[in-house]
């Protein structure tokens, strides 16, 4: 009974994650929602409500560009790819994304630069686009 209540409560949280994802696929959210609905609810509060779902001084596109730089510097391929997809959906140009990747090379080193450049190429190719 309690599990059904948790699943119903998290239905709205799942939809909020999907909206915040801007079409970028990340099935890990569904797993966390299934395995630990209570934690998923807290995660939604931090990630969706507090970071990417709220309006603040920085536009969402700028936040995504920052996340690209951070995930490159930390060498997180999945995060780099997801945030590139989201930035593109928010009308970031490939040049803006590349500059976020290049800035990340200072604190993160060349492996982050290579990761970001390759990820940008791969995402653009998957979308049938070219770097311009």
Region spans (language model):
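Acidic, glycine/proline-rich low-complexity segments that act as flexible tails and inter-domain linkers
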Residues: 1-62, 115-132
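A generic structural signal for short
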Residues: 17, 71-72
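Aromatic- and histidine-enriched alpha-helix N-cap/loop-to-helix transition segments
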Residues: 60-61, 95, 108
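Short, structured motif recognition centered on aromatic/hydrophobic residues
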Residues: 63-71, 100
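Mid-chain, well-packed structural core segment of small domains
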Residues: 73-98
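Short alpha-helical linear motifs
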Residues: 85-92, 108, 119-128
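Substrate/cofactor-recognition hotspot
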Residues: 103, 110-111
